[in-house]
Amino acid sequence: VSLLMAFMATVIGTTVGGALSFFASRNLARHYATYFVTRRMLEIARTVPDIVWALIFIYPFGVGPLAGILALIIHTTGAQGKLFAEVNENIDHKAIEGIRASGGNWYEEIRFAVLPQVMPNFISYTFWRLALNVQAATVMGFVGAGGIGHELITAVKLLYFLDAGAILLMIICTVFMIDMSSEKLRHWIIGKETLVGS
């Protein structure tokens, strides 16, 4: 359940955050009001800890994985949106000027000038976020928001220390494997980007 929570939160949060990042980038937003409002929304979503979001969602939705998934989605959206916006603000503007000179609209600028430059970083940060969300999904169980953390806290309360130790070991191994895999994928993507750039 924890892995599924982390995966869903990463996919949905990264997709929404990625889309909002273009409106939260000072160099891409067409209107300052759009930039300001979107940026503040992302900052609020990112600044409030995911565990606090989980406690907020437990009130209307009750104890269970739904509250945990929603909490992770909100926090991931804010974190990824803010991070992606900073990536967007460091792009080379020559490609945008070329699209604009040929009569392209804002969406065509994003599609053909911005995305090719930022996509490698977007993918790299997405894998990094997945590893973070696996750890966060584990903690969600401590407040009744689903995940393997709930099984761990139950085992500790019932004094099933052998079971608790096994669960803890499984959590550590899972996080370690995902972290190592995502790190290798990030290095592979960055290395590929370097080769293409050269």
Question: Where do the protein language model's features map onto the residues?
Answer:
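Generic hydrophobic transmembrane alpha-helix motif, especially the helices
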Residues: 42-73
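Short loop segments and helix-boundary regions at transmembrane helix junctions
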Residues: 24-38
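Membrane-spanning helices that line or support transport/gating and their immediate boundary helices
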Residues: 18-23, 83-90, 94, 133, ...
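Transmembrane alpha-helix signature in integral membrane proteins
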Residues: 1-24
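C-terminal transmembrane helix and the adjacent membrane-cytosol boundary/short C-terminal tail
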Residues: 124, 165-198
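Membrane-cytosol interface at the C-terminal ends of specific transmembrane alpha-helices
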Residues: 63-114, 120-129, 180
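Pore-lining and gate-forming transmembrane alpha-helices of multi-pass membrane transport proteins
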Residues: 5, 141, 150, 154-179
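Short amphipathic alpha-helical coupling elements at transmembrane boundaries
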Residues: 1, 36-46, 86-101, 112, ...
